[in-house]
């Protein structure tokens, strides 16, 4: 039996607890002694997993709590939800990504301007090549360049003769180089998707060299007739299309442009060899412009 002079250890423990903990501890558990602001701040950081390098998001959260303290004391727990936080951080993210989007837009504009310039210069060079293409029979100089005069006449008619002729040739080069990329976006065939690796700078240079070799070979070889030269060139064009590209959109573009050039100058065609001659030259030219346009618009 315990002596009356000795203190009861159970009562002593209860007295210490009543002195160190609030009286409402039994009702609210440890929420009374926990800092509410610190708890909300830690909870927000855990839920969003804020990166330490993106200091602007931390500043957004800190400024939110600062305004809340300044207006009405501590921020109530139920007013800070994940949706509100996502809105705040999304606004901060948009502000951070705005300079990069502006830079990307500027780069895209410069990229397309570069493509337009190169295609326009190629159109002018293509006209000069057509003027020097001939054989020793019916295919005389300047004969292949007649379809290109249609674009120049159209530009002069639209501008009342203000624009120079070389600008019309540049517009034709731009149109020739843009037909195949437009057809690629329209059809989106498996052949086009599988031939992306062919659209390289090396492939473009090879196609240009092939065109120059074929056109000047027509001039140097002694053909028995113009029909023989045009027929051999037509068979070679099919081989070059299969070797350099092989896509349906490229074939359709080359055929349509070749037929269109023949129709535009049907009054000047007096022999079947001349029809094939127009078809061969503009088929191969469309192949070269198609490769160049694909490369410029996709790189």
Curated annotation (Swiss-Prot):
BP GO terms, sorted: sterol biosynthetic process
Ranges in the topological domain labelled Cytoplasmic: 1-108, 183-237, 290-299
Domain of life: Eukaryota
Segments in the Lumenal topological domain: 130-161, 259-268
Keywords assigned by UniProt, alphabetized: Endoplasmic reticulum, Membrane, Phosphoprotein, Transmembrane, Transmembrane helix
One cellular component term from this protein's GO annotations in UniProt: endoplasmic reticulum
List of residues that carry Phosphoserine: 90
Topology versus the membrane: Multi-pass membrane protein
GO function terms (MF aspect): unfolded protein binding
Subcellular location: Endoplasmic reticulum membrane
Family indicated by similarity: Belongs to the INSIG family.
Extra information: Present with 3390 molecules/cell in log phase SD medium.
Protein name: Protein NSG2
Organism listed in the record: Saccharomyces cerevisiae (strain ATCC 204508 / S288c)
């Amino acid at each position: 039996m315990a002596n009356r002079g000795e203190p009861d250890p159970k009562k002593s423990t209860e007295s210490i607890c009543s002195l160190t903990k609030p009286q409402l501890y039994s009702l609210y558990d440890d929420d009374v002694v926990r800092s509410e602001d610190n708890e909300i701040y830690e909870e927000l950081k855990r839920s969003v997993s804020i990166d330490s390098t993106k200091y602007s998001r931390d500043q957004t959260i800190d400024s939110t709590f600062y305004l809340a303290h300044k207006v009405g004391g501590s921020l109530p727990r139920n007013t800070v939800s994940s949706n509100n936080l996502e809105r705040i951080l999304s606004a901060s993210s948009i502000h951070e990504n705005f300079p990069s989007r502006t830079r990307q837009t500027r780069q895209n504009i410069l990229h397309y301007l570069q493509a337009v310039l190169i295609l326009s210069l190629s159109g002018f060079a293509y006209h000069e090549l057509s003027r020097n293409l001939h054989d020793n029979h019916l295919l005389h100089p300047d004969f292949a360049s007649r379809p290109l005069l249609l674009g120049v006449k159209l530009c002069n008619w639209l501008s009342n003769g203000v624009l120079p002729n070389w600008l019309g040739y540049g517009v034709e080069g731009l149109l020739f180089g843009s037909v195949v990329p437009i057809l690629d976006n329209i059809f989106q065939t498996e052949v086009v998707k599988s031939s992306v690796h062919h659209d390289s700078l090396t492939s473009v240079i090879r196609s240009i060299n092939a065109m120059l070799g074929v056109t000047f070979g027509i001039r140097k070889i002694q053909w028995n007739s113009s029909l023989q030269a045009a027929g051999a060139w037509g068979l070679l064009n099919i081989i070059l299309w299969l070797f350099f590209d092989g896509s349906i959109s490229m074939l359709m573009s080359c055929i349509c442009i070749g037929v269109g050039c023949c129709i535009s100058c049907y009054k000047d065609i007096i022999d079947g060899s001349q029809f094939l001659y127009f078809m061969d030259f503009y088929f191969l030219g469309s192949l070269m412009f198609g490769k160049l346009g694909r490369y410029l618009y996709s790189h």
